[in-house]
Amino acid sequence: MSNNVISPEFDEQGRALRRIRSFVRRQGRLTKGQQYALDTLWPAMGTDYQAQPLDLTALFGRAAPVTLEIGFGMGASLVTMAAAHPEQNFIGIEVHLPGVGACLASAQEAGVSNLRVMCHDAVEVLEQMIPDASLALVQLFFPDPWHKARHNKRRIIQAPFVELVGRKLAAGGVFHMATDWQPYAEHMLAVMSDAAFFRSLSSTGDYVPRPASRPLTKFEQRGQRLGHGVWDLMFAKTV
C-alpha cells in the first residue's frame, strides 16, 4: 500500500503549493495486530490512491448502492454498518494507519466482504477517484471541529467541499453529518442551508434524531453519560 496520504502539488516553477487541510496526520504506533491486518488484508480490501476514476462495479465485483464514509476512526461503526447491510457497498477513507489496520482486522472478524478502505486525503479521493453521481450516501461523523476561531478555515465543512460532495452523490443521495460540538453543528447547518442543491431531511429544518443506521459508539455513550450533546444533520441532493 502507498504511505502518501496527500499528493504533492507544485506551481509552474516547481515550488510546492500549500493547501489548507482539515486534518493533521498523527503518527500513532501500530499494534502487531494492526500491522498484520495491513500486511495480509490490504490486497483484498485496501485501495491505493490513483488520480483517475474508479470503476466501482469492478472494485466490488457487483453493482450496488455505495456508501462512502470520511474519517472512520478505528472503523467500528463502519464495519457494523457494512455487516448489517450486505446488499450495499461501503468505502471508508481514513488518514491514520492504526485506524485503517484496526478496521481491516474488524472487517475480517465480522466476515465483511462489501467494504473497501483507503488511506488518503478524502478531498483528493473525491476529486480524482469517485465518479460523479455514483454515491447513495456520504457519511461524515465527528470530524475535527477545529475549536479555535483562527483554525475554523480548516473545518472540512466549507462551501467548496459541500459542492464536491453534491457532485458525487446521485440524485436523492444523502449527506449525513454528526458532531458533538454545537458551534460546529451550527456552522454545518449554515453551510448546508446555503447549498442550493441540498434540502434538509429534518422536519424542523435543522437537526434530526440519531438514525438507527448510525451505530452508537463508545465515545458517544461516554459523552451522553457526561451530558454532552450530539447533533445529526441529514441533507438530500435535490438535482
Swiss-Prot record:
Region (Interaction with RNA): 150-155
EC numbers, comma separated: 2.1.1.33
Gene: trmB
PROSITE patterns: SAM_MT_TRMB
Residues that hold substrate according to the record: K148, D180, T217, K218, F219, E220
Assigned GO CC terms: tRNA methyltransferase complex
InterPro entries, per database record: SAM-dependent_MTases_sf, tRNA_(Gua-N-7)_MeTrfase_Trmb, tRNA_methyltr_TrmB_bact
Function: Catalyzes the formation of N(7)-methylguanine at position 46 (m7G46) in tRNA.
Protein name: tRNA (guanine-N(7)-)-methyltransferase
Catalytic activity: guanosine(46) in tRNA + S-adenosyl-L-methionine = N(7)-methylguanosine(46) in tRNA + S-adenosyl-L-homocysteine
Family: Belongs to the class I-like SAM-binding methyltransferase superfamily. TrmB family.
Subunit structure: Monomer.
Pathway entry: tRNA modification; N(7)-methylguanine-tRNA biosynthesis
Catalytic residues identified in the record: D144
Source species taxonomy: Bacteria, Pseudomonadati, Pseudomonadota, Gammaproteobacteria, Enterobacterales
Keywords from the named record: Methyltransferase, S-adenosyl-L-methionine, Transferase, tRNA processing
Residues reported to bind S-adenosyl-L-methionine: E69, E94, D121, D144
Keyword hit for tRNA processing: yes
Single GO term (MF): tRNA (guanine(46)-N7)-methyltransferase activity
